[in-house]
Amino acid sequence: MLKKIKISLILALGLTSLQAFGQENPDVKIDKLKDNLYVYTTYNTFNGTKYAANAVYLVTDKGVVVIDCPWGEDKFKSFTDEIYKKHGKKVIMNIATHSHDDRAGGLEYFGKIGAKTYSTKMTDSILAKENKPRAQYTFDNNKSFKVGKSEFQVYYPGKGHTADNVVVWFPKEKVLVGGCIIKSADSKDLGYIGEAYVNDWTQSVHNIQQKFSGAQYVVAGHDDWKDQRSIQRTLDLINEYQQKQKASN
């Protein structure tokens, strides 16, 4: 009986420690995905509903590469502080996968802390029209990067969530960062489509499937990223939306 009590106490203390660790930084949740690649999740409210935004960062021998940014500028510093605390390395590069604030909103901040910032020329054009901070460097829709010993690729699949949405492929890890063109497996609808190209979206997702058929993990832009049925769910949601549009006409 005493042995059982001791085990229960150990488990309880362990759980408390884990919970406390998770609560050290309520602004950002970080999960190790594979090797030196981490998923970070932040939260914000849209139309009265709280959503999670997912992106990744890669720890290289030169420093940390951040894809996109925390959702909300109030989380930027705590995020980079957490990275330094966890890995002892600074953010040296930031890439925005489209022009919305949950992706490109950190370009100015990352630039100010000394990181090189990047976006596609298409994203840069949109940001310029909206008088928003822009990346220091721009590139055409597709580009391969090498940072130290690490490599990854930015790919433009076509229009979908926005005209400028790109995905990021990590070949060694076989991880695809889908951004907002890929909906989570638990999504109920396509979300914000004010700048979407729904009629192009299906083909763009098929382009992703064909090019990255060897992906072991696909990280959806919002909410649950662990359920790997996100690509099929995205296609289903597009079809459902189109069918409703046809029925209403």
UniProtKB/Swiss-Prot annotation:
Coiled coil: none
GO biological process, one term: antibiotic catabolic process
Cell compartments where the protein resides: Periplasm
Cited NCBIfam families: bla_class_B_core (NF012229), bla_subclass_B1 (NF033088), blaB (NF033107), blaB-IND-MUS (NF012146)
UniProt family annotation: Belongs to the metallo-beta-lactamase superfamily. Class-B beta-lactamase family.
Binding site for substrate: 183
Binding residues annotated for Zn(2+) 1, in chain numbering: 98, 100, 161
Pfam families from the UniProt entry: Lactamase_B (PF00753)
EC top class named in words: hydrolase
Residues at which Zn(2+) 2 binds: 102, 180, 222
Catalyzed reaction equations: a beta-lactam + H2O = a substituted beta-amino acid
UniProt keyword list: Antibiotic resistance, Hydrolase, Metal-binding, Periplasm, Signal, Zinc
Quaternary structure and partners: Monomer.
Official protein name in the record: Metallo-beta-lactamase type 2
PROSITE patterns tied to this protein: BETA_LACTAMASE_B_1, BETA_LACTAMASE_B_2
Alphabetical list of InterPro entries matching this protein: Beta-lactamase_class-B_CS, Metallo-B-lactamas, NDM-1-like, RibonucZ/Hydroxyglut_hydro
Source organism (scientific name): Elizabethkingia meningoseptica (Chryseobacterium meningosepticum)
Residues annotated as signal peptide: 1-22
GO-annotated molecular function: beta-lactamase activity; zinc ion binding
